[in-house]
Amino acid sequence: MPKSQALRWYGAVLRHAPTILRERKFYAADREMRGKLSFFLLGSTFSVDVDAINSTSGNGYAFLREFFIRQIYFREFKHVNFDTCLDLGCNTGVVTSLLKQMAGPQGKVYGVDPLTYPDNTFRAKTCATPGITLHQGVLCGESVRLDPAALHVMCNPYGFDTNHAITVKEVMETYGLKHIDFLKIDIEGAEFAIFRDSALWLDNVDNLAMEVHNSVGNPAEIILRLEQTGFQVKWLDDAGYPVDSRHAGYIYASKIGSLKE
């Protein structure tokens, strides 16, 4: 980020030091970062309107720190192409919109989430952005998709409509996606069922980054599946440090040599 922007944030950290030390979080300083800000990632500079993101619940700059500075989805990549992206677990569309900016004017980004957030202004704006498609879908594995009882067990606790159940393969078929340059996954534990079933759709994916919820399942299973389908795989814990595969918090995989050595 620009030096002046960094100094703004460091100044906010000093002003809110007592709160930051008490909460052990930088949120108090993050809330002072408003307006359009610039970030540098993978060789390019991006401008982001933090106030627009703050229309969602939560702290916009805190997430931008994770995305651009800690680079939670990109820290193990040396280069990535974003021409066609798939965002599984897109929520209100913040990551989807950032991926679209990274993809450029001709890029296409598809986001999937079980909720539509009808009152969220940021999501509404994202939906109207050329090159972005948001799909309401409850992601699941093929075995659950074909088992009505299992589908209700998965959906009912969250109030999800079983009619919106969809596999990754079906998402790709729905939108004619023959090739995905970058796949981001954050689906709150549902990733284990998706990778446990048939994963032929991975043949059409170059690079992927995912947040993996190791309290729900064993990340080593996903890592093995990725390796079996031809991916080079790396993983880190939630804080970004090397860890054994069972305790992975983030997984990064490439089929085209995009990971750092």
Where are these regions (language model features)?
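Phosphate/nucleotide-binding beta-alpha loop and adjacent structural elements of enzyme active sites
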Residues: 1-261
